[in-house]
Amino acid sequence: MTLSAISHYRGGSIDDVTPLAKTLKAIYLKYGVTYRLSRFQTGPNAGDWFVVVQYANSTAYEKVQTMFAQDPEYQQIITEIAKIAKRINRELVIDLDL
């Protein structure tokens, strides 16, 4: 079963976040990881960011974490994102195949 990391971030305008997200998505794709970015439009979190990063399974998740730790391009983009957006929370979920 696929495994997803679901994160909520606060901060950064669309103009600030979009180029960083595009770079991060390209890095994730290089490792076979799916990346989706959405923006809350209503409610108390309006303007915040919702991120879903999907891995093939838990083994793939563990393997790629080691690779990310050794990838300077990945480390750099994460550092840049942290300058403009704060992660509010992050959860790992098992995706159900319905």
What are these regions (language model features)?
Residues 1-74, 80-98:
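Short S/T/G/P-rich N-terminal loop/turn motif that feeds into the first structured element of a domain
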